[in-house]
Structures are given as structure tokens and as C-alpha cells.
Amino acid sequence: MGCTVSAEDKAAAERSRMIDRNLREDGEKAAREVKLLLLGAGESGKSTIVKQMKIIHEDGYSEEECRQYKAVVYSNTIQSIMAIIKAMGNLQIDFGDSSRADDARQLFALACTAEEQGIMPEDLANVIRRLWADHGVQACFNRSREYQLNDSAAYYLNDLERIARADYIPTQQDVLRTRVKTTGIVETHFTFKDLHFKMFDVGGQRSERKKWIHCFEGVTAIIFCVALSAYDLVLAEDEEMNRMHESMKLFDSICNNKWFTDTSIILFLNKKDLFEEKIVHSPLTICFPEYTGANKYDEAAGYIQSKFEDLNKRKDTKEIYTHFTCATDTKNVQFVFDAVTDVIIKNNLKDCGLF
């Protein structure tokens, strides 16, 4: 009699097994759901990373979606040349050819209507082409660290012939280069390596930061973007503040925040291509007066990496996963995101007791 297992005991054992199985299934499901928060100061490349996820994991932009970016490409191109011309006045740079002053006046007369209508009329394209070819305009462009200018300025202006054609349809690369300030929170979903990603792109300008906080709960990992090339620039919203210093301040507050004790922090030192071009003629001491190394890519980039990683106050328990990126280079982002995903899988399984 004592050795007989009662029906109640059998049922209880079965219930227990089901609960264990459900818990394990829930754990595995939780391990497959990834909430990624993209953080960083304004213009650090967060939105470009989101666009790359669409290209890499969601079959990219359709022809119709690319067409919808046409007006943004035109606006970015017009705004860029206008910013350079305005800066010439402030920096007291003359046109190489004095007749370009008439073109500048015409630019400002035509620009407003063109932007409102999302078009690039032939007369405006010709004006921009002549201005961009001027030696004085090029001299001002080479001093762009002294004023606010889109990173994509040269990309669009050098390709004006193609962009201004009547049958122009933006390419994926054109779309990647577009700049639209992110306001609020943009959510993207995709699946990769059997993981279901929810990626949140959050506006980086100071006025946007108060909107971040309610996104923080249950975050798997934070990708923090830094524009390496911003070491010699000031903020658009505060011309006294160096952009790299602002980025470091923000990273410090995120990395050492009690909310993120168990959150993987992935650091994207972005715009490495622009940094490599710039470091040769614009010394790192502009940002870090104590720097004594060479103004060469490897040494200077390594120094910036150590400055950010040294902000981590929990080095013994928290690792920062750093990658050098070029957000407009699809192959580079694909390679880096593959490595990031492997880290997330490992850490997720560990958290769920499955590793």
C-alpha cells in the first residue's frame, strides 16, 4: 500500500513537470526577445543604424520608398550649400569668382520654394553647381568644423549631376545619407539568428532626452553611438560645448546608471571614415589637450576608446563591448551587428539560466 503512487500524486507530478516545461519554454522565449535601445548624442549615426537594419534584415527600401526620400535629398543638398554660403560671411571668406555673389543671391531666392515643393529645378541646380565649384566656397567647406554642416554635404554636392536629373530615384546609399532630426522614439522590429529584435531609436538632442526614460524597462542591451569625427565640433544646441565632451558626459550617465546594472552596453565609435580623413589636419588636442600621441587614426581612435571605457565605474563586473563603425557602410554594419548579436545571445542565455 505504502509503495503505491496515488492518482493525486501522479497528477501533481505531471503538473510539476508541465510547470517546469512552461518555465523553460518561457525562459527560451524570453531569451529570444531582444529589446535594443539606441542612445547617443545628436548626429551620432543612430538613425543610420536603424536604416541599415532595414537594408540588412528587411530586404531594404523598395523603389517607391526610395522615391519618398527624394525631397529629403534635395532639402539636405540645398541646406548644405546654404550653410556654407552663410558661413562665408561669418568667416570673411570671399568668392574665388566675384560673379558667384549673384549666384548666392539667386540661391536664397530659389531655395525656399524648391524646398517647400520638394523639387530641384534646373536653374537652382546650375546655381548650386557653379557655387560648389568656386574656390572660395571650397575653402569655406574645408573649415566646416567652425560652423554646423551636415556630414552628407560633400556626398550630395559632388553628385549633383545625378541628383538633379529629371528621372532621379534615390539609391539605398542616398537614403542612408539623408539627415532628418529624430524627434520622439522610432521603433523597428526584425528577426535575426532566431532572435526577435525590437530596436528603439531615441532623439539625441538635449531637448529629446527626457523622453527616453520610459523606454528603459526590460532593455536587453544598449547600443551607444559616438561620432568619432565630432571631436573638433561644438553642439548645434550649445556652441560652448564640445560634442565629444557632451557624448562622454552622456555615456557616463548611461553606463553607470543603476537601471542598467545588468544591461549589456555596446559602444559604437562611429563615423570612423570621417575621423580618418579629419585627424590628419585637425589635431585631437582640440578636444583632449592632454593628448601627446600622434594624429594618426589608430593611435587617436584608441585614445578615444580608452577615454570612454575608463568612464565605466564597474569594470570588475561590467564589460563594455566596443566596435569601430561606419554606419553608412552596409558590410561594416552587417559584420559588427553579427558580433553584437552573438554577445546578446550569450548574455541572454546566461540571464535565463540556459548557458
UniProtKB/Swiss-Prot annotation:
Q: What is its main location?
A: cytoplasm
Q: Where is this region: G2 motif?
A: 174-182
Which residues are involved in binding Mg(2+)? S47, T182
May I have one GO cellular component term?
Answer: centrosome
Specify where the region named G1 motif lies, as residue ranges: 35-48
Query: Which GO molecular-function terms appear in the entry?
Result: G protein-coupled receptor binding; G-protein beta/gamma-subunit complex binding; GTP binding; GTPase activity; metal ion binding
Q: Name one Pfam family in it.
A: G-alpha
Instruction: Give a GO biological-process term.
Output: gamma-aminobutyric acid signaling pathway
Annotated binding of GTP, by residue: 40-47, 176-182, 201-205, 270-273, 327
Q: Which residues form the G-alpha domain?
A: 32-355
**UniProt entry keywords in alphabetical sequence:** Cell cycle, Cell division, Cell membrane, Cytoplasm, Cytoskeleton, GTP-binding, Lipoprotein, Magnesium, Membrane, Metal-binding, Myristate, Nucleotide-binding, Palmitate, Transducer
Residue ranges of region G3 motif?
197-206
Region G5 motif: start and end of each range? Answer: 325-330
Please indicate which superkingdom the organism of origin belongs to: Eukaryota
Instruction: State its location(s).
Output: Cytoplasm; Cytoplasm, Cytoskeleton, Microtubule organizing center, Centrosome; Cell membrane
What ranges does the record give for the region G4 motif, renumbered to this chain?
266-273
State the lipidation positions (S-palmitoyl cysteine).
C3
Subunit relationships: G proteins are composed of 3 units; alpha, beta and gamma. The alpha chain contains the guanine nucleotide binding site.
Q: What name appears for this protein in its UniProt entry?
A: Guanine nucleotide-binding protein G(i) subunit alpha-2
The record lists the organism as: Gallus gallus (Chicken)
Underlying gene: GNAI2
